[in-house]
């Protein structure tokens, strides 16, 4: 279903309206004898005593009502105070319970009754109200604001503030107005966002629309309502909690549980300053992070604003988003604006830097941070750091509503005190398009807890107007990193190395430096011939369904069998294939749509076909990195032991233009790989997904234990494959004779995922033990696993690819051309790139130990052109 979200008028705007309205004067009296008699003027209530004190007390129910009604009453109290020009504490507030009052005493009081209060006037007003009906009326010395449900009570309070506190003369002795609110929605919904998104947005929970205790006007505290929505989503197995456009006041830490994403409607701040979904961090001291992320959770599409922050003497109000946990699968942060955070996004910060993390995706994080914009330590496996941008311009452009400071004051403070991006002890990070302007340090490479920074591929950095563009506190001894096609501009230095940093080598190619690198023991190899590719050619398509219609397979008429997630091997016994295919067919006949599989297990005993304009989609809004159990898991049983796995029917075939697969995990329960020393015992399957049409895509999916992952046929022109995780026995991606395609953000493709299957899912078949068989399985992959094979394709673009173990990471054959940026293999058995027939142009290409220790980074009889090639630990 599609929903357009109504924006709640902020109370501050209502006060402005009030000031205008109070100053109005009556029109001139009519002079003609023929004019009808004027309607008698009904007197307005006097809300104050003669001494100026507030006459009315706001009363809410003690027992009948939850925080929704309580917060509605608080909003009315605060709104009345603002309308009268007094502090909120000057308006008394009470519950309807007290010991033994007389009826005469209660009747004599001047009260504003919010919700189902135990007063006769309130009870009489409630009579006959339907679930969506509300009533605002005056009965004697009582102002009644009530409704047939808590959602209706909230709507009544909003209407009272908007229509009556903005013009107190309208609160008359005969006031009586009824209204109707929208009924709370239920179930999963496709969201019609105000601002464009990369994907179709599917929400499992929409807190405001579903009646949770959240307030998009920013008046009431939304902390509890958001937390409850997140917890409810986690209990469903994970998914997306979507906050529609508005301002949500938060006063303490909100924890985002495992496999849950808190998502908003995000306007890119480079395109405007409406911002969409704004988290108003109403804190005056460091209460911890506003959002605390759990393993495999996410934050996406949110803007953070701190109303009590200032630019002259910034206050440490903690992190906007933080991850503290110890575990191999960290969280993901995408599409975030920081208007004026002290600290923006922090992963494993002190004192939690002893906790290792890996497999995070960090993309489109922008804003103004007064101390640190983004910081991460102790990353044990590669993460992708893409499209970050920090500058004073973001807060300055926010305007008066967001307390934009004096330009000179803010710029001076940032230039003297703040750091845009801190990268600590990271292994082989994949870094693309990080920008900083106007900071003391643009990029700070910090010493770490477990390692030091090494093996980085850094491309298209743009650091300008900083004191020091890049400061290197420590780099791992004798290892290498590469920087290409970047601008590093600092008044005191482009790249400055601490004297304590160990000896290492950094390749710098086709970069603009304001100063020569200086200090420390690092050797810089600089090549500015200008021959490398000038920039990465980014994908410009729209990988999403062509229609907003949503087909939820577990609902009627499909009633697809789904087994709730568990780790005892209970996958259910009913085949989900027919019901899912029926939904796919219906979506195709309707011209497109999203076929949604809520979190759980789905047995696939047959084959699925995805028609044109249709997206087959699981729960979530972020990439998959299952350190824990959650999300949508397809159990692949069909296609065991085919005659030719490379050409056998895939479990899922995308046959229509513009169709795709997103947010799914794949598990082959009958493929335990019990004895990795005998590959003939591997249970063979064909490809999991085949793309057999143009403009098709696979994004944000996880492969637990396939023999083969994704096959792109010659029909798959302009395919887009991005943010995959997991492992594979032979080939994860095969591309055959297309005109053009993109493969991006694959990192830490790692054999340990296969071995974790028994512990995570509770298999009933023998399974490798992660502690005993890791070396043997790595040996198998180093011999047989070529991760990406490109054959006969005119141009394939690769960005930010990392494989752990495996054979050749990228194979180029049959005259294909591959242009790759940031390609890395760790402990591979063979080369990072093997070009047998074709052309590779590579920017930042590396491999570490593995094989015989002397295997080249690139090999083959084809043409190989590489800028910044480095072999670590030969």
Residue positions per predicted region:
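Right-handed parallel beta-helix
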Residues: 264, 295-306, 328-340, 355-372, ...
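Extracellular "leader-to-stem" segments immediately downstream of a signal peptide or signal-anchor
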Residues: 32-39, 86, 149, 159, ...
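Structural motif
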Residues: 59-67, 113-118, 146-149, 245, ...
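Solvent-exposed alpha-helical segments and adjacent loops
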Residues: 35-200, 657
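Bacterial N-terminal signal peptides that target proteins for export
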Residues: 2-12
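Sec-dependent signal peptide cleavage junction
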Residues: 19-39
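Structural detector of coil-to-beta-strand junctions
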Residues: 240, 278, 287-290, 310-322, ...
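Bacterial N-terminal signal peptides
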Residues: 12-20
């Amino acid at each position: 279903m599609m929903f357009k979200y109504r924006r709640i008028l902020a109370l501050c705007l209502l006060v402005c309206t009030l000031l205008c309205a109070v100053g109005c004067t009556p029109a001139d009296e009519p002079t003609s004898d023929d004019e009808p008699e004027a309607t008698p003027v009904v007197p307005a209530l006097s809300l104050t005593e003669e001494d100026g004190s507030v006459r009315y007390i706001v009363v809410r129910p003690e027992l009948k009502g939850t925080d929704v009604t309580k917060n509605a009453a608080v909003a009315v109290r605060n709104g009345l105070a603002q309308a009268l020009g007094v502090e909120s504490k000057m308006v008394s507030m009470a519950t309807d319970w007290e010991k033994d009052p007389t009826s005469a005493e209660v009747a004599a009081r001047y009260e504003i009754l919010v919700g189902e209060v135990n007063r006769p006037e309130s009870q009489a007003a409630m009579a006959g109200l339907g679930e969506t009906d509300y009533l605002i009326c005056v009965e004697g010395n009582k102002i009644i604001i009530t409704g047939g449900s808590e959602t209706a009570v909230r709507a009544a309070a909003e209407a009272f503030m908007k229509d009556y506190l903005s013009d107190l003369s309208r609160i008359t002795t005969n006031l009586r107005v009824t209204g109707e609110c929208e009924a709370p929605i239920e179930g999963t919904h496709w969201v019609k966002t105000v601002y464009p998104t990369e994907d179709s947005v599917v929400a499992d929970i929409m807190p405001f629309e579903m009646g949770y205790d959240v307030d998009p006007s920013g008046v009431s505290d939304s902390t509890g309502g958001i937390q409850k929505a997140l917890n409810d989503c986690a209990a469903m197995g994970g998914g997306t909690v979507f906050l529609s456009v508005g301002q949500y006041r938060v006063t303490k830490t909100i924890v985002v549980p495992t496999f849950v994403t808190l998502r908003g409607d995000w306007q890119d701040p480079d395109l405007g300053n409406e911002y969409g979904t704004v988290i108003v961090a109403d804190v005056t001291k460091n209460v911890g992070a506003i959002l605390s992320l759990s393993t495999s959770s996410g934050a996406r599409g949110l803007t953070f604003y701190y109303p009590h922050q200032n630019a002259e003497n910034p206050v440490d109000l903690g992190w906007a988003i933080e991850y503290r946990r110890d575990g191999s699968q960290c969280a993901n942060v995408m599409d975030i604006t920081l208007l004026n955070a002290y600290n923006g996004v922090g992963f494993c910060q002190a004192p939690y830097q002893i906790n290792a993390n890996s497999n995070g995706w960090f993309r489109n994080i922008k804003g103004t941070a007064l101390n640190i914009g983004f910081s991460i330590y102790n990353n044990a496996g590669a993460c992708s750091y893409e499209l970050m941008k920090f500058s004073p311009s973001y807060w300055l452009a926010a305007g008066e509503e967001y307390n934009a400071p004096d330009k000179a004051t803010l710029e001076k403070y940032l230039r003297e005190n703040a750091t845009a991006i801190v990268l600590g002890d990271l292994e082989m990070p994949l870094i693309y398009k990080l920008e900083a302007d106007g900071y003391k340090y643009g990029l700070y490479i910090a010493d770490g807890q477990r390692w030091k920074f090494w093996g980085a591929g850094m491309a298209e950095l743009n650091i300008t107007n900083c004191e020091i563009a890049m400061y290197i506190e420590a780099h791992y001894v004798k290892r290498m990193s590469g920087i290409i096609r970047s601008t590093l501009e600092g008044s005191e230095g482009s790249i400055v190395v601490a004297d304590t940093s160990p000896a290492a080598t950094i390749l710098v190619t086709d970069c603009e430096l304001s100063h020569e690198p200086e200090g420390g023991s690092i050797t810089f190899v600089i090549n500015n011939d200008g021959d490398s590719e000038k920039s990465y050619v980014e994908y410009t398509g729209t990988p999403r369904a062509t229609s907003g219609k949503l087909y939820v397979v577990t609902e009627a008429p499909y009633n697809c069998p789904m087994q709730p997630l568990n780790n005892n091997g209970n996958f259910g016994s009913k085949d989900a294939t027919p019901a899912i295919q029926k939904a796919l067919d219906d979506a195709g006949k309707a011209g497109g749509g999203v076929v949604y599989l809520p979190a759980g297990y789905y047995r696939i005993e047959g084959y699925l076909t995805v028609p044109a304009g249709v997206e087959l989609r699981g729960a979530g809004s972020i990439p998959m990195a299952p350190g824990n159990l959650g999300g949508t898991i397809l159990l692949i049983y069909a296609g065991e032991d085919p005659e030719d796995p490379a050409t056998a029917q895939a479990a899922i075939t995308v046959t229509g233009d513009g169709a795709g697969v997103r947010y799914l995990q794949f598990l082959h329960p009958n493929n335990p790989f019990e004895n990795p020393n005998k590959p003939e015992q591997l249970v063979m399957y064909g490809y999991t997904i085949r793309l057999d049409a143009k403009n098709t895509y696979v994004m944000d999916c996880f492969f637990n234990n396939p023999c083969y992952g994704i096959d792109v046929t010659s029909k798959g022109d302009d395919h887009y494959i991005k943010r995959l995780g997991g492992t594979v026995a032979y080939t994860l991606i095969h591309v055959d004779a297309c005109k053009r395609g993109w493969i991006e953000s694959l990192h830490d493709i790692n054999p340990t995922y296969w071995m974790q299957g028994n512990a995570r899912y509770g298999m009933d078949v023998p399974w490798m033990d992660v502690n005993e068989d890791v070396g043997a399985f790595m040996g198998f992959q180093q011999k047989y696993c070529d991760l990406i094979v490109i054959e006969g394709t005119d141009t394939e673009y690769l960005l930010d690819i990392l494989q752990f173990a495996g054979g050749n990471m990228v194979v180029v054959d049959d005259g294909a051309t591959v242009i790759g940026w940031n390609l890395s293999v760790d402990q591979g058995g063979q080369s990072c790139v093997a070009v047998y027939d074709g052309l590779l142009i590579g920017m930042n290409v590396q491999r570490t130990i593995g094989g015989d220790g002397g295997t080249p980074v690139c090999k083959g009889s084809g043409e190989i052109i590489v800028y910044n090639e480095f072999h670590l630990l030969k």
